[in-house]
Regions:
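Periplasmic OmpA-like peptidoglycan-binding domain that tethers envelope proteins to the cell wall
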Residues: 116-187
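Short glycine-rich, basic-tinged beta-strand/loop micro-motifs
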Residues: 108-118
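Periplasmic peptidoglycan-binding/tethering modules of Gram-negative envelope proteins
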Residues: 2-110, 166, 180-187
Length: 187
């Protein structure tokens, strides 16, 4: 499949009359790097299995995970060069609970950002990041989708951690859902 020649900088999915909130919670810490590390033997093959490299595939991150303020839902360990979500991940209990919360809590709005590891040309990474974000967006129910302000790739060369290990690259092949409550200055 050919990589698109141009990827929009605006939200990938046009959102109906919904402006991005001003007071998003601060994003989880990130690393900006242009370093490229090679895949290890069998790293790609293992990444394409349901088990992948990390357990669990869905985690809460950001402020203290036990605190509902400024939590982010991180869906990680996508297969190398995959945009789709693994079947095992789709049945994750935390993912199911959070999707239900997102659908029923009408005060929440969302920003969804896709990430990739640093391997391969940046143009391909933007394609993967965009596809991952869009696929996670489509997991949301109709109410939560209608309250999503941003669905797009993360900034080029921005990662959750340095890509120097197998686990770090699996962590970076991810999507983060940033919830926001306009009723509060910051959630």
């Amino acid at each position: 499949m050919a990589v698109p020649a141009w990827t929009p900088t605006d939200p990938v999915e046009k959102m109906p009359n919904l402006q991005p909130p001003i007071n998003w919670c601060p994003a989880p810490p990130k690393v900006v790097s242009t370093d490229v590390f090679p895949y290890q033997a069998n790293e790609i093959a293992i990444s394409l299995t349901e088990g992948g490299h990390l357990t669990p595939d869905v985690v809460l991150t950001g402020a203290a995970a036990s605190n509902s303020l400024c939590q982010f839902l991180l869906i990680r360990d996508f297969g190398v060069n995959w945009r789709h979500i693994k079947a095992l991940t789709l049945h994750d209990a935390l993912l199911s609970a959070q999707l239900q919360r997102f659908e029923t809590d009408k005060t929440l709005q969302f920003m969804i950002l896709g990430y990739s590891d640093s391997a391969g040309p940046e143009r391909n990474n933007v394609f993967l990041r965009t596809g991952r974000a869009k696929n996670v967006f489509h997991l949301l129910g109709p109410s939560a989708r209608s309250r999503t302000a941003v669905v797009k790739p993360a900034t080029p060369n921005e990662y959750f951690t340095v890509n120097s290990t197998v686990a770090a690259r699996a962590q970076n092949r991810s999507v983060v859902i940033h919830p926001h409550s306009p009723d509060d200055a910051i959630i």
